[in-house]
Amino acid sequence: LKGINTKAEVTKDGLILTGAKSFISNAGSASFYTTLAKEGDGYSLFLVPADVDGLTVSPSPEIIAPHVLGELVFDNVALPESSRLGEPGAAFRHVLATLSVFRISVAGAAVGLMQGALEEAVRHCSAREQFGRPLAKHGPVATLLADSWSDLESSRLLTYQTAAMAANDPEGNLDRSSLAKLTATEAATRVVDRCVQSMGRWGLIRGSKIEKYYRQARPMRVYEGASEVLRLGIASRLVKELGDGS
């Protein structure tokens, strides 16, 4: 949160929002933007209409992403007090709950991606023969498929468990959702890579399903919390629970 430079200033007529947000999901197609801004000594959330005066939306550089991204610039955007979500300066707990939900959703997407990639690889390796036997019956290929299934099912179970826990305590589940997101997205990279390898040159065809999965798997380790950042938080929680508590 310390890196947020968007600010909200209270005036006699309401609020003035200034700053910018980069790589915002669905920028340009959304009707409203939920915006986090520094207000006083804390942080607040605001619901900003897309057509409000002073708000400029422009596309981000083209990147590998599952949805449209863009930049929002708030140039002295005037808002009523009623646009604030919750109490002034009390957005932190809402942010934690939102991050928890988003990270679980990314973990779920990674599980679905693994499922699709593995099904594609199994179909190919069962139908294509080499030296008189299906590829799936050759030891090296069978190992790729088996390890991928192991990654898929362990990620699926952790994601389901985390979602069930979040339903009861969304605000206190961030570390667990971070663990699910880290586990599933890292596994997705391994699984899709193995699937490409098992399919040989057929896994390298541009425009194929497996090529699409390969492209989609990589950014999952970056958005909604990069893997390296998640590891720091997870390790900190682990030390508190199992270490000396500091």
PLM-predicted stretches and their roles:
Residues G3, D51-P80:
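Flexible, small-/acidic-enriched active-site or ligand-binding loops
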Residues L1-K2, N26-S31, P66:
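Short glycine/proline-enriched turns and hinge-like loops at secondary-structure junctions
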Residues N76-H94:
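Long, acidic (Asp/Glu-rich), low-complexity accessory segments flanking structured domains
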Residues K21, I63-I64, R103, K181:
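Active-site PLP-lysine loop of aminotransferase-like
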Residues N5-K7:
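Beta-sandwich/jelly-roll carbohydrate-recognition scaffolds of carbohydrate-active enzymes
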Residues T18-V57:
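A short core secondary-structure module
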Residues L1, V10-L15, V73, A97-S246:
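Alpha-helical interface subdomain recognition
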Residues E9, T35-K38, L47-P49, V73-D75, ...:
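Short beta-strand-to-turn element immediately C-terminal to the catalytic PLP-Schiff-base lysine
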